[in-house]
Amino acid sequence: MNTLPLISVFSKPWPSHSAANLSDVLLSLGFKGIELPIREGFQVTPDTIEKALPKFASELRQNGLGVFSIAGDVDEVTIRACGESGIPILRTMLKLDSTISYQENVDTFRRQCEELYPAIQDSGVSIGLQNHCDGFACSSLSVIHAIEPLRSDCVSAVLDLGHTGLEGEREDLAIDIAWPRLSMINLKNAIRFPDGTDAAGAVKWNRTWVSGKE
């Protein structure tokens, strides 16, 4: 029995490739699957997802490339399209509305997920909540806190190690915290670096994406 983890790549850099061309490129790089962004300007958009996602996913599989997850809207249409396409994870993030409290943002997300339980269970899909930086739920702890009372067969944790780096979170601790509900890890690397000072003399910090060894 093969217990090696599945390794996919976010297909964001190839928004206009056909299924055949995208498969050729990524299979040549050694990948067996992708995470597909559902966005305007890409192969599948929020408006076309019902018909376009099953079709595009089927074409990719015919060319030897799987779709392991999508990044898209959390709604019933998207969930059912994932189910029809055989895609197990719908990745999302919790963007914080600054006009309400953090807990109110979390409660809104939880209610949204609970209302979608029937569609999630019918479709065999998991909503994967990912950490992000800045104005989002930004740590492994915030992700686990948000999803903790939700059904584990319906909502899971996705950990992005680039954003743990930007937030100054230790990667090993972040993985340990998220592990009980973890469905996917995003492997990328980012750092903050000093970039001059402001008028008050405080250091300004910028960010950059770097190779894994840095």
Q: Model-predicted segments: where are they?
A:
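Conserved beta-strand positions
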Residues: 9, 36, 70, 92, ...
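The substrate-binding groove and active-site-proximal loops of carbohydrate-active enzymes
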Residues: 13, 99, 103, 208-212
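Active-site acidic/histidine proton-transfer and metal-coordination neighborhood
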Residues: 20-24, 59-62, 66-157, 166
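Boundary/entry segment of secreted carbohydrate-active catalytic domains
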Residues: 1-19, 37, 71
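A short, Lys/Arg-enriched amphipathic alpha-helix followed by its capping loop at the start of a domain
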Residues: 2-7, 25-32
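Acidic/histidine-rich catalytic cores of soluble enzymes
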Residues: 118-214
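Glycine-rich, proline-tolerant flexible connector loops at the mouths of alpha/beta enzymes
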Residues: 35-57, 61, 100-101
